[in-house]
Amino acid sequence: MSIDDLKSKIPDFAKDVRLNLSSMASDETLTPQQKYGLFVACGIASRNADVRKALVAEAAGKVDASVIQAAKAAASIMGMNNVYYRFVHLASNKDYRTMPARLRMNVISNPGVDKVDFELWSLAVSAINGCGMCIDAHEDVLRKANVTAEAIQAAVRFASIIQSAAIALEAADTE
């Protein structure tokens, strides 16, 4: 399955989603590694099998397997961190902020790819998962690494498009 296959499954009520998928596929704001890593990480984070399969397949022929593995790791580790840190951020009891997380997250310091790319993928997945604390932390790391606001915005735009594709497919499944 490819992005074109995915677009063909998007119903007419979500025509904008199809158009956004097309623009995302041809976007050149990011490096190929950043772009296809986002496809994989956000496809997994969308929790939709069709979206995940299409985007992983799209990336498979365009980047090294290590990029795909690292993007999978970003989605996985953010699945854990986004839940934990969203709780810490939203809980009325601020004592949780001073407690050690006691969660293993070694992959963040040694992702096997450029750390900036891994941070970009982590930011996008954090946006999908709605963890404001994680969004702020990853955006700060990216800005300190001189990543442009346009690149950061592109990553979050990709995340929003990918998530909307998953929702459109779920909505179509109710017809």
Swiss-Prot record:
Its EC number is 1.11.1.28. InterPro entries: AhpD (IPR004674), AhpD-like (IPR029032), AhpD_core (IPR004675), CMD-like (IPR003779). Belongs to the AhpD family. GO terms for molecular function: alkyl hydroperoxide reductase activity; disulfide oxidoreductase activity; hydroperoxide reductase activity; peroxiredoxin activity. Antioxidant protein with alkyl hydroperoxidase activity. Required for the reduction of the AhpC active site cysteine residues and for the regeneration of the AhpC enzyme activity. The keyword Membrane does not apply. The active site is at C131, C134. Signal peptide: none annotated. This is Alkyl hydroperoxide reductase AhpD. GO terms for biological process: cell redox homeostasis; response to oxidative stress. HAMAP family: AhpD. Disulfide bonds join C131-C134. Keywords: Antioxidant, Disulfide bond, Oxidoreductase, Peroxidase, Redox-active center. The keyword Transport does not apply. It catalyses: N(6)-[(R)-dihydrolipoyl]-L-lysyl-[lipoyl-carrier protein] + a hydroperoxide = N(6)-[(R)-lipoyl]-L-lysyl-[lipoyl-carrier protein] + an alcohol + H2O. SUPFAM superfamilies: AhpD-like.
